[in-house]
Amino acid sequence: MERQLNMQQQEVTHEFFMPLLIPSVTHQEKQVHVVKGKPMFYEPAELKAARTKYMDNLAQHLPDKKFNGKVRLMIKWLFPIKGKHVNGEYKDTKPDLDNSVKLLQDCMTKLGFWKDDRFVVSLITEKFWSDVPGIYINIEEVE
C-alpha cells in the first residue's frame, strides 16, 4: 500500500520500500577542480551512478500528487548483514547518515515528490543491518 488517506485527521502519507544494495558513495564526495582560478564542482562517475540508481528506483514510487505543504520524512536504510551482525541491529559504520540523506533527498526533490525540499520540516533517519537490503521511505503531511 503506497498511499493512504486517514479520514479522521486528513493526513496524507506515502510509503514504499525500494529493495536495492545501497550505494556507499554520498553527496559529500563531489570533486572540485580549479579552472582559470575558479572552483568547478563535478560529480565523479561513482556518484553519478548512485544518483542514477536512486532516480530510477524512486521514479517507480512517485506519489499521485506532489506534497505542497509541510512533511515528515522517515528513511530507514537497510544494509546487507556482514560479519556477526543480526537482522534489525543498528549499523554504526559508514556511510554517515547526513551525507546519505542529502543525495536521496535531492533526487526526491528533482523527481517532484514535493514542491520544494524546504517543506521537509521533520527528518527521521536510521540505518540497520538487514536480511533484505534496501530503503524504506515514509512521507507524511504534518501541520
Where are these regions (language model features)?
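Acidic, proline/glycine-enriched N-terminal capping motif
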Residues: M1-E143
